[in-house]
From Swiss-Prot:
Transmembrane segments: none annotated. One of its GO terms (molecular function) is FAD binding. This is UDP-N-acetylenolpyruvoylglucosamine reductase 1. It comes from Bacillus cereus (strain ATCC 14579 / DSM 31 / CCUG 7414 / JCM 2152 / NBRC 15305 / NCIMB 9373 / NCTC 2599 / NRRL B-3711). GO terms for biological process: cell division; cell wall organization; peptidoglycan biosynthetic process; regulation of cell shape.
Length: 301
């Protein structure tokens, strides 16, 4: 491992951190250390990292802004690549937007709304990165990434880089082909937006933000929605009908504001959260015969 670290540093791939606590990089403020954390400063840094990872036969994982993650208390084995400031370029040409995967989604939707471009209003309260949003087809307010994405540039596991169209990404509810058949890293995204009235777009975004503030617990560290909605039900409604609102294990608590959120009230461990997730699954199955599936990604040792 030490030799790999030295080669990564010599290759100037970006910041290279050893045994770095991942709680610093997730919105839940939970997570053990990464053996090696890379914050690449350019695409070439990612390519070189993957070359070395293959050479050393080391496991690797990619994270974005950590908004939809629950990282194990034992951390993540191997190399963790965090997409961020090195991949945050932005080009706007009329209605076409080309943006790096590390660009914050809220910042992007806010900026474009002020330019009178419509289509990303739903993302005004999603605290993730563009890359993560494409990877999981993030959405809210009856819309999602698939409704506005034209194509995405992907770095595949074998080192190949290619564009995948909206159709090729095979989007579905909170899912894409990148999670299953064609694993890879989102490097860039191209969105096709529409011209709109600036005042109306900004008002719509503000309404979305206000709704989220009133109904969701953003005053505590959390990872967003824990479960996918088991259509035709809403996950939060089922949790609340089961009488689990406010239930606590250790430092983790099912939010008093919204049943589909688990918050870190202070000092919560990943195991606390996992115990709550299992409690919810079993309770909902027993009471309503509904299977619950997590939307939050659970990773680590």
């Amino acid at each position: 491992m030490e030799q790999l670290v030295n080669e990564l540093i010599e290759a100037d791939v970006g910041r290279v951190l050893v045994n770095e606590p991942l709680a610093r990089y997730t919105t839940m403020k939970i997570g053990g250390p990464a053996d090696i954390l890379i914050v690449p400063k350019h695409v070439a840094g990612i390519e070189k990292t993957l070359q070395l990872v293959k050479q050393y036969k080391t496991k690797w994982t990619v994270i974005g802004r950590g908004s939809n993650l629950l990282v194990s208390d034992q951390g993540i084995e191997g190399v963790v690549i965090r997409l961020g400031e090195g991949l945050d370029h932005l080009e706007v040409e009329k209605h076409k937007v080309r943006v790096g995967s590390g660009y914050p989604l809220i910042k992007l939707s806010t900026l474009l709304s002020r330019q009178g471009l419509a289509g990303l209003e739903f993302a005004s309260g999603i605290p993730g990165s563009v890359g993560g949003a494409v990877y999981m087809n993030a959405g809210a307010h009856k819309s999602d990434i698939s409704s506005v994405l034209s194509k995405a540039l992907i770095l595949f596991e074998d080192g190949a880089i290619d564009w995948l169209t909206n159709k090729e990404l095979e989007f579905s509810y909170r899912a894409s082909v990148l999670q299953t058949k064609r694993p890879g890293i989102v490097l860039e995204a191209v969105f096709q937006l529409q011209a709109g009235k600036r005042e109306e777009i900004v008002r719509s975004m503000q309404n979305n933000k206000d709704y989220r503030r009133e109904t969701q617990p953003w005053n505590h560290p959390c990872a967003g929605s824990v479960f996918r909605n088991p259509i035709p039900h809403f996950a939060g409604d089922l949790v609340e009908k089961a009488g689990l609102r406010g239930y606590r294990i250790g430092g983790a608590q099912i939010s008093e504001m919204h049943g589909n959120f688990i918050v870190n009230t202070g000092g919560a461990s990943a195991q606390d959260v996992l115990s709550l997730i299992e409690l919810i699954k079993h309770t909902i199955k027993d009471k309503f015969d509904v299977d619950m599936h997590t939307e939050v990604e659970i990773i680590g040792r």
